[in-house]
Structures are given as structure tokens and as C-alpha cells.
């Protein structure tokens, strides 16, 4: 008879215990994730908007939009403003192209006027904070701002720009997005409130 004092048996017992713990944790995380998703909650892991939990809302089709909603949307490399830009999205089957959606706050709606310049993004005469453009991302890849100018937001269009992160890859680089690309409308539910400068462009 071999007792638990046997080194090999003890080692196997410890490994089995750890494996059981990992399995329990994995099932717990999956259960919580499915429960939150079923209740209309979405978790944001990116750095361009506050990290944390967002609550899904109905499509806010009419103004006033207070507080401004956020959107999860699926970009398309065929959009004029997306051609030649780096792809920061993680592989995922959520969007038709096999990558994860982006999450950004909506700052301009049909009928609004957007002006882009070297000073940043202005909506209806109000300059948005942290919207200066850069010519290279955090990894050193070239990145081009959307053509500077004044734009009247057309029906079926939205402008999505994050003031939370000066490194956000958003409409300041790819311009307006089609409203039909939106997968979810959300509002912050339980999120961080401070930007971390070391975060990468996403």
C-alpha cells in the first residue's frame, strides 16, 4: 500500500486539485458571463472607452441623446476611411469579417455638423476633449486622420469619437459609420473612470 507521503502520489494529487480548481473557475466564469449576457450586459476589455460592464439599451433614435450612448459596431475594411488603416481588432466571430466589434461613444447624429482639424473634433461648435490626431499608433504603425473639413451628418450616419482616450481609433481616423453597422446600443453600468496613458491605440 502506498501512502500519501509518497512524493509522486502527492505531486499527482496536487496537480489533480489544481485542475479541479481551474475547471470550477472556468465554469463559474462561463456561468456569470452567460447570465450577464442574458440580462443584456456586455463587458468591454478595450482601452478606448472605460473598462467595465455596459448595459444594453434600446435604439435611441430621437434626440436629445443624454447621456450619449455607446455603440458596439462592426467596421468594414471597404469603408473609404478604413482602407490602409491598421486592424486593432481581435479575432472573433461576432462580426461578418471574423473580428470583434469596436465600442465607441456616439458624438454626432444626423443633422449635426462635425468639423475635423489639427485642433481636434468639433461637434456643433463644441470642441471635444482628447481628440487630437496622431500620425503613428502606439506600436509605431503609420495612421492617417480622416480628411480635415466640415461635415454635415447625413441620415443613416453616426460619428463615434472617444474623449476618454486620446489614443482611441475612431471617427477621427475613419470618418462617419453607417448606423446599420451597429450591433448593440449600450450605456456604462459599472466602469472605471480614469484613462491609463500606457494603453495602446484601439
PLM features: residue spans?
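Extended hydrophobic leader/signal-anchor segments used for secretion and membrane insertion
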Residues: 2-202
Amino acid at each position: 500500500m502506498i501512502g500519501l507521503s509518497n512524493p509522486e502520489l502527492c505531486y499527482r494529487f496536487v496537480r489533480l486539485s489544481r485542475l479541479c480548481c481551474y475547471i470550477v473557475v472556468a465554469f463559474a466564469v462561463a456561468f456569470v458571463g452567460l447570465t450577464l449576457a442574458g440580462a443584456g450586459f456586455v463587458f468591454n476589455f478595450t482601452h478606448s472607452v472605460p473598462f467595465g460592464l455596459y448595459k444594453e439599451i434600446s435604439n435611441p433614435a430621437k434626440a436629445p441623446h443624454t447621456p450619449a450612448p455607446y455603440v458596439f459596431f462592426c467596421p468594414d475594411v471597404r469603408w473609404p476611411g478604413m482602407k490602409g488603416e491598421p486592424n486593432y481588432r481581435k479575432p472573433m466571430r461576432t462580426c461578418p469579417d471574423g473580428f470583434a466589434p469596436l465600442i465607441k461613444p456616439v458624438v454626432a447624429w444626423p443633422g449635426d455638423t462635425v468639423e475635423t482639424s489639427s485642433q481636434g473634433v468639433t461637434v456643433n461648435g463644441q470642441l471635444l476633449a482628447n481628440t487630437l490626431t496622431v500620425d503613428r499608433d502606439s506600436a509605431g504603425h503609420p495612421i492617417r486622420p480622416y480628411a480635415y473639413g466640415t461635415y454635415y451628418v447625413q441620415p443613416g450616419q453616426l460619428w463615434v469619437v472617444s474623449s476618454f482616450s486620446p489614443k482611441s481609433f475612431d471617427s477621427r481616423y475613419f470618418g462617419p459609420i453607417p448606423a446599420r453597422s451597429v450591433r448593440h446600443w449600450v450605456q456604462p453600468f459599472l466602469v472605471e473612470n480614469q484613462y491609463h496613458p500606457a494603453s495602446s491605440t484601439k
